[in-house]
């Protein structure tokens, strides 16, 4: 992906470029489009004359598109100017959101969400690379965390707001509003994002595709995937865990989700600062150890409501810190082993987290059936331990001790 022109952007010692915050706004719009479906499943299913289970395919279709689009389409678009790719993905989001609002049947909705998911994967990959290229290396982690903050805010605040709007108006109006937000974000990027001038900076399409299968990048992506497996083998079933095992009521459950969302925002920013202030590998190892202990805490303290609130908060903090740290690790490895493929590396991170989320949900379901609901916390902790072992193995292989 060509980003040579970003060298022309003044790099202030204190403030991040405005384009970083616009990228965050755009990632918020994409995140809202992805996550809002979970809060709108019932009215969508009713309006489209489908079952809730069938309507749940709207979530899977989007995630599948993002997982494919992030590494593969990003590699295929490696030679295109960054601003052009970003604007094209925002146009897809705007048009796709309007198409969702007007969808006459579930099949049409699923198809549109898959296409928008493809654009989502490309946008987050290219935006992640662009953010780190717009600032000095010493602030790359913070810039990346601001871009990803948009997704975190969409999950923590945008989804409850959108669910409420869907209840008082209609789910179609919510998607139409996302389309307007996408247009505003794209218009801002049109003026704030510098135009590319040197196409030779980016790797060729073939070289970018080869980067996807580079062993160092695959190992780092494996760590990222295990982070998601550890988190979502538990978090996917957090509602029955808290309601049935901890004795919390709906009010406490809402408070727990609020703690998760609020701390997730802090975790996103913390991950960026840790990536800038110390080696990302060492910070990731410490965060993984804390994640494993956090999940063990859910198992051991499940009868303590206040402990559950605190642990929900630290789960959000640690997971989103690891999202930023893992992406920075992949970007750093790409610079060492396949220069010019940074955006593809960011896409590989996105695909890994999406795959890990799906695998984590499946693992949790298997554990519940085979052992019981409490076991999901133990399963998550073991996945965190596996991530630590894989990270340690990679550090030894690269002769870069933690």
Stretches found by the model and what they are:
Residues 69-81, 267-279, 368:
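Helix-to-loop junctions at the C-terminal end of transmembrane segments
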Residues 123-135, 321-337:
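Intracellular juxtamembrane helix-capping segments at the cytosolic ends
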Residues 68-106:
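Conserved MFS/SLC helix-loop-helix module at the cytosolic interface between two early adjacent transmembrane helices
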Residues 112-150:
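Cytoplasmic helix-loop-helix junction between adjacent transmembrane helices
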Residues 49, 81, 102-108, 247, ...:
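Helix-breaking motifs and short loop linkers at transmembrane-helix boundaries and internal kinks
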Residues 339-370:
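A late C-terminal transmembrane helix in Major Facilitator Superfamily
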């Amino acid at each position: 992906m060509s980003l040579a022109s970003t060298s022309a952007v003044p790099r202030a010692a204190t403030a991040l470029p405005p384009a970083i915050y616009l990228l965050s706004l755009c990632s918020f719009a994409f995140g809202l489009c992805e996550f809002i479906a979970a809060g709108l499943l019932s009215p969508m299913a009713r309006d489209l004359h489908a079952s809730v289970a069938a309507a749940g395919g709207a979530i899977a279709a989007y995630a599948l598109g993002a997982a494919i689009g992030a590494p593969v389409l990003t590699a295929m678009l490696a030679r295109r100017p960054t601003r052009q790719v970003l604007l094209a993905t925002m146009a897809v989001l705007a048009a796709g959101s309007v198409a969702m609002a007007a969808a006459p049947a579930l099949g049409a909705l699923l198809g549109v969400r898959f296409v928008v998911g493809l654009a989502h994967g490309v946008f987050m990959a290219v935006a992640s690379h662009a953010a780190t290229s717009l600032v000095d290396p010493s602030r790359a982690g913070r810039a990346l965390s601001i871009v990803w903050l948009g997704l975190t805010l969409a999950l923590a605040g945008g989804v409850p707001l959108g669910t409420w709007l869907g209840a008082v108006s209609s789910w179609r109006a919510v998607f139409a509003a996302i389309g307007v937000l996408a247009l505003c974000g794209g218009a801002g990027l049109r003026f704030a994002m510098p135009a590319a001038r040197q196409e030779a900076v980016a790797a060729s399409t073939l070289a970018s595709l080869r980067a996807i299968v580079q062993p160092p990048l695959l190992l780092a992506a494996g760590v990222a995937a295990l982070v998601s497996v550890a988190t979502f083998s538990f978090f996917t079933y957090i509602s029955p865990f808290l309601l049935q095992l901890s004795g919390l009521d709906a009010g406490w459950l809402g408070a727990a989700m609020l703690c998760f969302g609020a701390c997730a925002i802090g975790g996103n920013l913390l991950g960026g600062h840790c990536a800038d202030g110390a080696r990302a590998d060492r910070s990731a190892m410490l965060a993984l150890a804390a994640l494993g202990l956090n999940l063990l805490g859910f198992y051991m303290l499940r009868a303590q409501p206040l402990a559950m609130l605190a642990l929900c908060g630290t789960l959000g903090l640690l997971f989103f810190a690891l999202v930023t740290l893992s992406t920075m690790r992949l970007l750093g490895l790409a610079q060492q082993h396949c220069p010019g493929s940074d955006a593809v590396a960011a896409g590989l991170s996105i695909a890994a987290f999406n795959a890990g989320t799906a695998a984590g949900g499946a693992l949790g379901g298997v554990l519940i059936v085979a052992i019981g609901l409490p076991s999901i916390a133990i399963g998550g902790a073991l996945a965190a331990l596996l991530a630590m072992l894989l990270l340690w193995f990679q550090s030894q292989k690269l002769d870069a001790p933690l």
